[in-house]
Amino acid sequence: MMTKVLGMAPVLGPRPPQEQVGPLMVKVEEKEEKGKYLPSLEMFRQRFRQFGYHDTPGPREALSQLRVLCCEWLRPEIHTKEQILELLVLEQFLTILPQELQAWVQEHCPESAEEAVTLLEDLERELDEPGHQVSTPPNEQKPVWEKISSSGTAKESPSSVQPQPLETSHKYESWGPLYIQESGEEQAFAQDPRKVRDCRLSTQHEESADEQKASEAEGLKGDIISVIIANKPEARLERQCVNLXXEKGTKPPLQESGSKKGRESVPTKPTPGERRYICAECGKAFSNSSNLTKHRRTHTGEKPYVCTKCGKAFSHSSNLTLHYRTHLVDRPYDCKCGKAFGQSSDLLKHQRMHTEEAPYQCKDCGKAFSGKGSLIRHYRIHTGEKPYQCNECGKSFSQHAGLSSHQRLHTGEKPYKCKECGKAFNHSSNFNKHHRIHTGEKPYWCHHCGKTFCSKSNLSKHQRVHTGEGEAP
């Protein structure tokens, strides 16, 4: 009937965009009179995500229905792979947003994740402007749905919509075909679903509903501002620094910035490699908390890692792992003199005995050492440094091993026990000397004549015969 009044053909088929202004208005009004609206991508997405297994009689039917719902949402027949991928990325991006930001972004109907990011960045820039207020300024541009709902056609009820002259409906020309036939609705919707949604809003909402939405949007905007400020990188860093200061028992400094006074200062973002974890005992700084924890054990003497074989304790797990290899039978690193080692570093140190290689030299006396640790321990002879002190008697030692051995005099501990005869020792060196009685091992080799000895002291006595200092034993 309506097509006859307007002089249209009774059957409407696809036409070029410039010829579809008339049927566009007619079909929109007919749909509104019936109370039917085009489905949205969001509705199809929700139908796919909320589909339940119990809605179908069996697993095959459930899988088939899921395929149908997925195709209704992603539209693989008209969307490219890149467009489908972008829809999935957009969905996940909206999912990880805070609830307040989700609602705000969805109101703006972004068609891609990049568009959603642009919306959020624009909002952040708006919040960073000086003198920003939570309430909407008078000259602020209204949201899209507010603009449409404030038009004259939106104030009329759907039943009162009348056909408009062609010259007043040019604003719909750029939207493309919306309603052509019943079978063409989905194709028209796929071209621009957001504008169909805007058209639906423009003919459905009344003025009272618009005012209520504007009030809700105002409250939502305040929540959005709080979420954005709380989730800014500098705010997260500020919370971390506050937690770090709380561990030290200090309060972070306060500063005045603009119109906000008493607010905690926001520190700058730490640069890579910055050492923010400081030892309260000596002031040494570290780039991460785990290294600081390990360092603190040098002050407390804590040794939480204990060997289950001999009871020896270590401050680091890596040292315990290296030590535990000494109890294993497997010693894959062999020296040509017959001695075997569990670690390649120990073999290298041992081989320096044969080559007389001593790359680490003392600057004070010129004495050379095969290991860097030996040089450090030797250097304390010149400085007189004895950093390790016994808590029982106050005696100090230049080496930690000396303190550990001394403390066993107070405790009576003898952790080194011989499996052959059961004899126990409080020093590993004494245990090693004793153990060679059972094994017949002679690890100390004279590089002049090739003779071997079971102890270093016997080798020293023997070498005097080559240097002319005394007779060989």
Curated annotation (Swiss-Prot):
Residues 127-167, 247-272 are annotated as: Disordered. Gene3D superfamilies: Classic Zinc Finger, DNA breaking-rejoining enzymes. Strong transcriptional activator. Plays an important role in spermatogenesis; essential for the progression of meiotic prophase I in spermatocytes. One of its GO terms (molecular function) is DNA-binding transcription factor activity, RNA polymerase II-specific. Belongs to the krueppel C2H2-type zinc-finger protein family. CDD domains: SCAN. A zinc finger (C2H2-type) spans 277-299, 305-327, 333-354, 360-382, 388-410, 416-438, 444-466. It holds the Pfam family zf-C2H2. The gene is ZSCAN21. Residues 45-127 form the SCAN box domain. The keyword DNA-binding applies. One of its GO terms (biological process) is male meiosis I. Keywords: Activator, Differentiation, DNA-binding, Isopeptide bond, Meiosis, Metal-binding, Nucleus, Repeat, Spermatogenesis, Transcription, Transcription regulation, Ubl conjugation, Zinc, Zinc-finger. One of its GO terms (cellular component) is nucleus. Its main location: nucleus. Residues 148-167 have a biased composition (Polar residues). Transmembrane segments: none annotated. There is a cross-link at K27, K221, K232, K349 (Glycyl lysine isopeptide (Lys-Gly) (interchain with G-Cter in SUMO2)). It is found in: Nucleus. This is Zinc finger and SCAN domain-containing protein 21. Residues 258-272 have a biased composition (Basic and acidic residues).
